[in-house]
Design a protein with these regions (language model features):
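Conserved loop-to-helix N-cap of the C-terminal "lid" that shapes the substrate pocket in Rossmann-like
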Residues: 96, 105, 130, 135-143, ...
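Conserved catalytic-site region of short-chain dehydrogenase/reductase
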Residues: 31, 66-78, 102-108
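A conserved pocket-lining segment of Rossmann-fold NAD(P)-dependent short-chain dehydrogenase/reductase
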Residues: 116-137, 145-153, 160-162
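Active-site beta-alpha turn of Rossmann-fold NAD(P)-dependent dehydrogenases/reductases
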Residues: 26, 61-65, 98-100, 162
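NAD(P)H-binding glycine-rich loop region in Rossmannoid oxidoreductase-like domains
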Residues: 4-47, 51-57, 66-70
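Conserved beta-loop-beta element that borders a ligand/cofactor-binding pocket
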Residues: 85-105, 115
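Conserved catalytic Lys-bearing alpha helix of Rossmann-like short-chain dehydrogenase/reductases
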Residues: 42-48, 79-87
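Mid/C-terminal beta-alpha module of Rossmann-like enzyme folds, strongest
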Residues: 149-210, 224-226, 232-260
């Protein structure tokens, strides 16, 4: 493992020498600083693509995001759209995978953070009525798709990798509560109040786990294309309930918590 800032050229590029494949996963997901999104989603991508070309690496797998087809207008969505466009214009053959909201082991954000927050508070707030449809994707299934792209030498195509079960946000929270045996009370609060509380939080936390932009994205009512990716990539689909149970109750890996 080497820690490096991919937005800057450096010693990390030596690891590309004689590489057979590059899986491009890096991304700035949350935060309130636009320049962090530019550096980690745009500048880093430019450096990686240039290095792939310089080393004549034959295979690239690009991890994009379902948000490139979202109605949202925020830092993450806009820079991920630009990132995907950079890959398409690079001339490098690569399958482009667009996962929806992911969850699984070692999740320091998203459902992982929500589960830990739920364990700490007596009341868990839900914005509005909580009926915001999600299409959560189990990260282990997505890993199998990436492996399939590498092993089967998939060279091109844009694939919308959506979870196959539509589930409202509030029901997703209830499933997490059930999986971790939480006693917290789930309470709906007005959207504007929830937004205001996040806005206040951002004044005291430079890297908040959930931002007002992410709240807008949550309530954007996006519904992404569902393709038959289990057959396309010859992988198995894990049901949401089974995946949630494995995520939070595995005797070994569910206890591993990464620093936020």
């Amino acid at each position: 493992t080497e820690y490096a800032d991919l937005a800057e050229t450096g010693d990390w590029q030596q690891h590309f020498i004689e590489a057979d494949v590059v899986v491009m996963l890096q991304a700035q997901i949350g935060g309130n600083n636009y320049q962090e999104f530019v550096r980690n989603n745009i500048d880093s991508t430019r450096n990686i693509l240039n290095t792939v070309k310089d080393q004549n690496i034959p295979n690239l797998v690009h991890i994009s995001s379902s948000v490139v087809e979202s109605v949202s207008n925020d830092y993450y969505t806009n820079t991920k759209k630009e990132q995907e466009d950079m890959v398409l214009k690079s001339g490098i053959s690569a399958p482009i995978l667009r996962p929806t909201l992911m969850f699984g082991w070692f999740d320091r954000k998203h459902l992982g953070w929500l589960s830990r927050f739920m364990k700490k508070v007596p009341v868990f707030p839900i914005p509005g009525d909580g009926k915001y449809m999600r299409q959560p994707l189990y990260s282990a299934d997505f890993c199998d798709i990436i492996i399939s792209c590498i092993e089967n030498n998939i060279q091109s195509g844009r694939y919308n990798i959506s979870g196959h079960e539509n589930i409202d946000y509030i029901d997703m929270i209830r499933e997490i509560k059930k999986a971790i045996n939480s006693k917290t009370l789930i309470v709906r609060i007005p959207y504007q109040l929830f937004y205001f509380l996040l806005w206040i939080w951002a004044f005291f936390d430079k890297n908040p786990p959930f931002t007002t932009q992410q709240l807008k994205a949550l309530t954007a009512s996006d519904e992404f294309e569902v393709i038959d990716w289990p057959n396309i990539f010859d992988v198995e689909y894990t049901s949401f309930s089974e995946a949630i149970d494995t995520t939070f109750n595995d005797p070994v890996y569910s206890k591993v918590i990464l620093d936020f």
